[in-house]
């Protein structure tokens, strides 16, 4: 199959996509926009596509999920193409690295031993393997290797989990609740904008820790709260439109009453 045939091959799979990307990045005949992109310039798109995958999952839209997973795969192919051009890595070496990692992290699956390990022992092995991986990357500190690019709440929980492994953690949830109350007081007493900024961050960090102790994913919890707010406010708007009004023509008293009405209808 020649190159043009591969571009239009309906069942060309990953090789088809890799060839399309090479064509887009071709310095002589490629797309000017695609040619000038770098790891850094497409990084925001990589994050955006990952969130769009999550959005499709949460909406249970499987047709859209297929497309969004393709968009996310394109980001991996894009980074791989840039890496290949710079002699760093290519798509196949990326696949080999993650394959090796998965095999190494699952000795209970990929070894010849017939002895089954308990879930607790598997977790211990997993943590030991990850610790060895961090050491290989010279990540010797307890908090080394927690990605800076993670959503802030997710990163907070990961940092707290790492600290907890070495004993730096509150033993009971009541202690975390006391700290939440303390941080709220410090926020209300903050005088400057910079101080309020700092204290609000401290409060959010402790709330993430509270979520961790309660075994709640704070990112998912906040996403659910966002969806609930969107659903309820949209219903408030619908009720206003039905009355011949709009949010801008209404007032807080009326909208608050409608909000409580919507809440009551959900119960």
Where are each of the predicted segments found?
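Flexible "arm" and connector segments at domain edges
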Residues: 1-68, 74-200, 204-267
């Amino acid at each position: 199959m020649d190159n043009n045939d591969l571009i239009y091959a309906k069942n060309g799979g990953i090789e088809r996509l890799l060839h399309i990307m090479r064509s887009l990045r071709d310095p002589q005949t490629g797309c000017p926009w695609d040619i000038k992109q770098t790891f850094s310039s497409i990084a925001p798109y990589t994050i955006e596509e990952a969130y769009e995958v999550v959005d499709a999952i949460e909406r249970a839209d499987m047709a859209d999920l297929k497309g969004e997973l393709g968009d996310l795969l394109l980001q991996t192919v894009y980074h791989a193409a840039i890496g290949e051009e710079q002699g760093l890595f290519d798509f196949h070496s990326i696949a080999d690295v993650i394959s090796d990692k998965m095999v190494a992290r699952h000795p209970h699956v990929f070894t010849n031993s017939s002895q089954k390990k308990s879930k607790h022992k598997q977790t211990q092995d997993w943590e030991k393997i990850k610790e060895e991986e961090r050491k290989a990357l010279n990540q010797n500190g307890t908090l080394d290797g927690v990605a800076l690019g993670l959503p802030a709440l997710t990163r907070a929980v990961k940092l707290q989990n790492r600290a907890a492994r070495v004993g730096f953690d509150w033993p009971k949830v009541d202690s975390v609740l006391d700290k939440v109350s303390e941080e709220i007081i410090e926020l209300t007493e903050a005088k400057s904008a910079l101080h309020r900024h700092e204290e609000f961050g401290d409060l959010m960090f402790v709330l993430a820790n509270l979520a961790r102790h309660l075994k709640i994913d704070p990112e998912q919890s906040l996403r659910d709260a966002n969806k609930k707010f969107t659903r309820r406010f949209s219903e408030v708007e619908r009720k206003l439109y039905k009355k011949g009004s709009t949010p801008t023509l209404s007032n807080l008293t009326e909208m608050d009453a409608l909000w409580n009405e919507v809440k009551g209808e959900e119960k």
